[in-house]
Amino acid sequence: MGRKNDIIQKIDSFIGQKIYSLRLAKGLSRQQLAEVIDVTHQQLQKYEKAINRISVGRLVLIAEALDRNIDYFFEGLEEANKPQPVHTQHQRMCIEVSRNFMKINSTEEQQAINNLVKCLAGKEKLKTNV
């Protein structure tokens, strides 16, 4: 019975992490998403940290609020059984960059930063008309 509980906990953690990461990527606070799905921000935190299990109905609401198909939350689940670090330095930096980016109120400045990142990533040439 313990093995099944371990697997269930890993699945809950996997889905919670996907919710957390996507929420940050969308620039939503925990409070903002919680209001949309009609739960408290504390309850959403419990979902993200896999303290409480998410019902399928609630997961559908979360998927809609984050503009994703529900399948998104299960993509890569097979890999979840492999041991992975909780947060690498790189992941922490990505989260910090995302949080700071969302604090920029100017759309033009956000676009300029996005262009710079694309340039540094080698995706396109730097645009200077912003």
From Swiss-Prot:
This entry's Gene Ontology molecular function terms read:
DNA binding
Report domain HTH cro/C1-type positions: 19-73
**The keyword Transcription regulation appears for this protein:** yes
Against Pfam families, the record matches this protein to: HTH_3
What ranges are recorded for DNA binding? 30-49
Q: Which domain of life is it from?
A: Bacteria
Keyword list (alphabetical) reads: DNA-binding, Transcription, Transcription regulation
What protein am I looking at?
Uncharacterized HTH-type transcriptional regulator RP497
